[in-house]
Amino acid sequence: MHIEARLFEFVAAFFVVTAVLYGVLTSMFATGGVEWAGTTALALTGGMALIVATFFRFVARRLDSRPEDYEGAEISDGAGELGFFSPHSWWPIMVALSGSVAAVGIALWLPWLIAAGVAFILASAAGLVFEYYVGPEKH
C-alpha cells in the first residue's frame, strides 16, 4: 500500500499546485478576476486525493509488506490465489444498468425514474452481494 499512498500523494500535490497556478493565472489574465469554479474544483480534487493517500498510509502501517512494495520484486513473487471471482455473474451488469437508469432520471429530472433507478440499484446490489449466500436451512 506504500506505492498507492505515494501515487495519491503525488496526485494531490499536482492538483493543489495546479489550483494555485490556475487561480493566479486567471486573476492576472481573465477579465472578471479569479475563476472560482475551476479553482475550487481543482482544490477539492487535491483534497480528495489527499484523503485517499492518508487512508492508504494508515492501511499500509497495519498490513505486512506486499511484493508491490519492493523495488526488485518479480511478477512471480505475487503469484498465488487472490480470492474468489465469479466470471459468469450477471449482477454487475444489472448494477450498471440500474445506475444508468438513475443517472438518466437525474439528468432529465424525472423523480419517478430516479426512484425506480434507486430501487433497482438496491435490488441489484443485494443480488450481487448475496449471489452465493445459501442460508443455514438450505443444504
Curated annotation (Swiss-Prot):
InterPro entries reported for this sequence: Cyt_c_oxidase_su4_actinobac (IPR021050)
Reaction(s) the record says it catalyses: 4 Fe(II)-[cytochrome c] + O2 + 8 H(+)(in) = 4 Fe(III)-[cytochrome c] + 2 H2O + 4 H(+)(out)
Group of enzyme by EC: translocase
Tree of life domain: Bacteria
Subcellular location: Cell membrane
E.C. number: 7.1.1.9
Entry-linked Pfam families: Cyt_c_ox_IV
Keyword Signal: no
One GO BP annotation of this record: electron transport chain
UniProt KW keywords: Cell membrane, Membrane, Translocase, Transmembrane, Transmembrane helix
SUBUNIT field: Associates with subunits I, II and III to form cytochrome c oxidase.
Family to which the UniProt record says this protein belongs: Belongs to the cytochrome c oxidase bacterial subunit CtaF family.
Role: Part of cytochrome c oxidase, its function is unknown.
Name listed for the protein in its UniProt record: Probable cytochrome c oxidase polypeptide 4
Organism name: Mycobacterium tuberculosis (strain ATCC 25618 / H37Rv)
